């Protein structure tokens, strides 16, 4: 099991992107969360098997129908926070 912290740049707020991310995470049985940041980007913390996380990152790069991802950064960690499901964090 690994943890990925992902920062997504582009048109990713106000376009259903967090819901899209949650659906993609649920398809892969990943745990963690997604939230909007004050700087206009979206932050994701996802935990699960490496192959599922890699597939998830590809889906996030492609984005949802109304989003436009321009940049993505991924930080990998072996320390897990022990999430049991994937959720949207509302601020």
Swiss-Prot record:
Entry annotation: catalytic residues: 18, 36
Assigned EC number: 3.6.1.7
GO molecular function: acylphosphatase activity
PROSITE patterns named among the record's database cross-references: ACYLPHOSPHATASE_1, ACYLPHOSPHATASE_2, ACYLPHOSPHATASE_3
UniProt entry keywords in alphabetical sequence: Hydrolase
InterPro entries according to UniProt: Acylphosphatase, Acylphosphatase-like_dom, Acylphosphatase-like_dom_sf, Acylphosphatase_CS
Domain Acylphosphatase-like: residue ranges: 3-90
Family recorded in the similarity comment: Belongs to the acylphosphatase family.
Name of the protein in its database record: Acylphosphatase
Designated gene of the protein: acyP
């Amino acid at each position: 099991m690994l943890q990925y912290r992902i920062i997504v740049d582009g048109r990713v707020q106000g376009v259903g992107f967090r819901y899209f991310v949650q659906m993609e995470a649920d398809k892969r049985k990943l745990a963690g969360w997604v939230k909007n940041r004050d700087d206009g980007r979206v932050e994701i913390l996802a935990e699960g098997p490496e192959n599922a996380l890699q597939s998830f990152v590809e889906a996030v790069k492609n984005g949802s129908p109304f989003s436009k991802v321009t940049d993505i950064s991924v930080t990998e960690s072996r320390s897990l926070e022990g999430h049991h499901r994937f959720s949207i964090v509302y601020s």
